[in-house]
Amino acid sequence: MTRDDKFPIVYSLLLIVLLFVSPIYGDGDADALLKFKSSLVNASSLGGWDSGEPPCSGDKGSDSKWKGVMCSNGSVFALRLENMSLSGELDVQALGSIRGLKSISFMRNHFEGKIPRGIDGLVSLAHLYLAHNQFTGEIDGDLFSGMKALLKVHLEGNRFSGEIPESLGKLPKLTELNLEDNMFTGKIPAFKQKNLVTVNVANNQLEGRIPLTLGLMNITFFSGNKGLCGAPLLPCRYTRPPFFTVFLLALTILAVVVLITVFLSVCILSRRQGKGQDQIQNHGVGHFHGQVYGQPEQQQHSEKSSQDSKVYRKLANETVQRDSTATSGAISVGGLSPDEDKRGDQRKLHFVRNDQERFTLQDMLRASAEVLGSGGFGSSYKAALSSGRAVVVKRFRFMSNIGREEFYDHMKKIGRLSHPNLLPLIAFYYRKEEKLLVTNYISNGSLANLLHANRTPGQVVLDWPIRLKIVRGVTRGLAYLYRVFPDLNLPHGHLKSSNVLLDPNFEPLLTDYALVPVVNRDQSQQFMVAYKAPEFTQQDRTSRRSDVWSLGILILEILTGKFPANYLRQGKGADDELAAWVESVARTEWTADVFDKEMKAGKEHEAQMLKLLKIGLRCCDWDIEKRIELHEAVDRIEEVDRDAGGGQESVRSSYVTASDGDHRSSRAMTEEFSLM
């Protein structure tokens, strides 16, 4: 047999192997799940698990008839068994053989006993949700040592005791840790993760000093622990030993005696000096003091500012000390080149627009400040200037992805943007370690706040016409970004309800747009919304349709009134788990009940609302090839707006797809479509 004759045989054998291997993996997942089910009590609620069908089915292996099982590319990636009245002692050892398992949630059941056996064997797990059960006992300090992929751990609402496992503080990717409402004792271990956003230990029995790395977190995360102290709680008291107290008192008395002696000596010497020389010296000292250390009225202004935050004061003090030699006129205009006086240039507030009131960095830092929010990138403050104007200062910590000149160029490019649905950038401040971006303050606040915050008397309700107006404006602003940034894969990159502000007429204004090029890659992938799209979580890539995915999530949020992050504590939240949230909307019976009741829309609007719901679902289709492109979403939303009696103007004429420059008319895009 010749060498050429052997090739068909080899290929045939390979084909046979592939045909057999594929179902083996599927059967392996099924066997593991059935073995796990056999260890549960009251498992009758697990519908479809005994159907004889594989857990993952469909053309691309992304569908599952097994209740609570989520699949991707033919393998199980998440197990979500919540509110099913399951009980007994949980044993997850059988799940260790499911290679692609990234997330498990057993929240709000009746499991008891110690932390599930075999949990440390799930080394690929990224999300662990065991909250609101009846687990008890101590957790071994090294339990999580081998689970390096963990991003989110939710153990709240149980009766765990003993010390918080030190291995949690050593998980390199950890961003979220919820341990509230347990019985943990001892001290909080050290947490040094750079991307850590939440460590909630409220309502335990912890004591000692809060680690410095957690000092900027929300104060409520540490409430209900009588023994805790340190930022953000009250300072810790230090009880000195008696000997140290006596020694300190003696040292103080000695210092006072020395100071009195020095003072008397200076007085005697000063009287012997000439009057003219004395005047010259006094004038020189006073002039120097005024230049370097500032004016008394500045100190009074700072002391009177009741809203000023400690973090903002720290930033102001650091900057004032660094910039103490800068003059009050050190202010830059948009045309300044980054090559001009690079050292002095870093002390300036650079304005990128010529239609805004000018103020200096010192003016801004002297203003009374109010903390608006804090997130993965940094913090936001409202600064009330002495002129009466209010601005928002956003302090970013992870903007070193490009060099100084490229940063200047990109900020000036953003400053030149002009669209009714974009909040314009006013100015920026550059330092290598941190950046400040300044925008106007919008009193109505964010869409997220109006959708989800507790209702206050007299607050405007977002009815159907307003919500449609918001969707239309958001889409138009996004289409404009797509047109002016044809080379950016993610023209917005961080589209979410908290980044949509509403002006007095409830016209939406997009914020935090076009920042992907300047944000560090690790942080952008960790925190920016576009990187939660399934094509990135599964294939490590983004596309021009990733922002469309974010738009779809936003449309569903606006229509249902449900905040995706609320599902985080129920195992339905960020990252790949948004699939379950979207799926829950898609599978809900499409009646008026799916919509937020606060919209108060009549039956005459139901057809338009359902049409917009379909558009939202098409925008966030899990399959990127089936997901509609932005130009199609624009056309469909404009059609809904026209059907509802909205404005006749369209943004289609100004939008061009980046891939093919397609100029298809709106009419060609308005045919009825089917989702299922």
From Swiss-Prot:
Glycans are attached at residues 42, 73, 83, 218. Residues 1-26 form the signal peptide. Residues 319-347, 641-676 are annotated as: Disordered. Residues 27-242 are extracellular. The chain crosses the membrane at residues 243-263. It is an enzyme of class 2 (transferase). Gene3D superfamilies: Phosphorylase Kinase, domain 1, Ribonuclease Inhibitor, Transferase(Phosphotransferase) domain 1. The modification Phosphoserine is found at residues 368, 446, 543. Its EC number is 2.7.11.1. Pfam families: LRR_1, LRRNT_2, Pkinase. It is a single-pass type I membrane protein. LRR repeats lie at residues 98-122, 123-146, 148-171, 172-195, 197-218. GO terms for cellular component: membrane. The keyword 4Fe-4S does not apply. Belongs to the protein kinase superfamily. Ser/Thr protein kinase family. This is Probable LRR receptor-like serine/threonine-protein kinase At4g31250. It comes from Arabidopsis thaliana.
